[in-house]
Amino acid sequence: MHKQELPRAQKLAERAFANLERFLHIEAVSGIVLLIAAVAALIWANSPAADSYEALWHTPLTFGVGSHVYSQSLHFWINDGLMTIFFLVVGMEIRREIHEGALSSLRQATLPMAAAVGGVAVPALLYLSFGHAPADQQGWAVPTATDIAFAVGVLALLGKSIPSNVRVFLLALAIIDDIIAVLIIAFFYSGGLDYTGFGVAVIGLLMVIGLQKIGVGSAYAYVIPGAIVWLGILLTGAHPTLAGVVLGLMTPVTAMPMRERPLDAITRFTGELLGRAKAPEQDASDLMDPLKRLRLAQRELLPPVVRMQGTLHPWVAFGIMPVFALANAGVSLSGVDLSAEGPQWVMIAVAVALVAGKPLGIVSVSWLMVRLGWCVLPAEVNWRSIMLVGLLAGIGFTMSIFIANLAFVDPGSLGAAKLGVLSASLIAAVLGLTWGVWSMRSAASATKAGSPT
């Protein structure tokens, strides 16, 4: 019995690490793509063609049928439409981590949860300590966010000498950070709620539940119910991207039940397909039925949350996020009056809160939890590693810019906040790389000194 269970457990562990490796690889490469998009946006917004940059994102885009039309700017469809898919993937990541990952047990989740709370509370308090005007105080949440793609991307530049548990800790912290960001958006940056929209959203959610109950596995079947949920949340006055999180959390984490085991079905359909293909007078149309059933069995082999995340993640990482960066990172330097007291302090406060507040909050709360005996550091994770995670968490970039768009009404303050986010993200990345290289060299020197000659 034990001999049978061991290989199975080993295979499950290998699959889990393979998924994590693929996830980290996509995040690392997408961080470079995001950087290119942000630099392109800054250059474009400060070039002689700056007017075309603004004009492009204000281009109206209309959807509808007959007299029922809805028209908004391209910027709206990116920030409120495409970003819903990003938050859908975030919701699915949270769902998976709760089911079988770093958040699956209280013991595993306690330290990254506490560190994430510290990494949100300290930057927020640090920002407010600058004594802003009432309108600018709304930006307190801007420095609380972490851009997981950039943070993991910078960590990947340090190579495989960084222990895998450091990567897992950063990933868990960033996911909890995303949960807190979603709650902040829901409670602090959604307007007065119109409860009639909840009825529309509930109809969409009931449709999703109904499709899941009857075992519909095709993602296309959920597009219309998902759009209804998005519309309902938009009508309530809450930020419509929350629809993505809700739908992501509802995605099943277990494979759809089949009449026979998926692997047995794949074996049988493959045999049937080979038999028909080798027939002396076979018709190509004869292959369609076993091919269709084979694709269905392959699809049902994986849980929907794994399948959907694997499909959407590259599109989000290499499509939606770079487009978001291109549309939002283009700050015209001539349009931001940093000599004015308000915008100047907004930029400084955001930058200081991200660069100093993030590591201070993460390291201090982690130290306190360990000191009190409520948590222990994961294997191969030391205080230098926690400091590295804290520095990298100061890379707010896309998530911080997203919150800034919700927090600031004044264009000058918004531009200053974006400049603060961009400069802080760059500084945090450089500090993180420098600290990481120094830590690796120190660890290598200590190992060499302790080894027998």
Swiss-Prot record:
It is found in: Cell inner membrane. One of its GO terms (molecular function) is sodium:proton antiporter activity. This is Na(+)/H(+) antiporter NhaA 2. It catalyses: Na(+)(in) + 2 H(+)(out) = Na(+)(out) + 2 H(+)(in). It is a multi-pass membrane protein. Na(+)/H(+) antiporter that extrudes sodium in exchange for external protons. InterPro entries: Na/H_antiporter_dom_sf, NhaA. It comes from the Bacteria. Pfam families: Na_H_antiport_1 (PF06965). The chain crosses the membrane at residues 23-43, 74-94, 111-131, 139-159, 168-188, 191-211, 214-234, 235-255, 316-336, 345-365, 386-406, 419-439. Gene3D superfamilies: Na+/H+ antiporter like domain (1.20.1530.10). Keywords: Antiport, Cell inner membrane, Cell membrane, Ion transport, Membrane, Sodium, Sodium transport, Transmembrane, Transmembrane helix, Transport. GO terms for biological process: regulation of pH. GO terms for cellular component: plasma membrane. Belongs to the NhaA Na(+)/H(+) (TC 2.A.33) antiporter family.
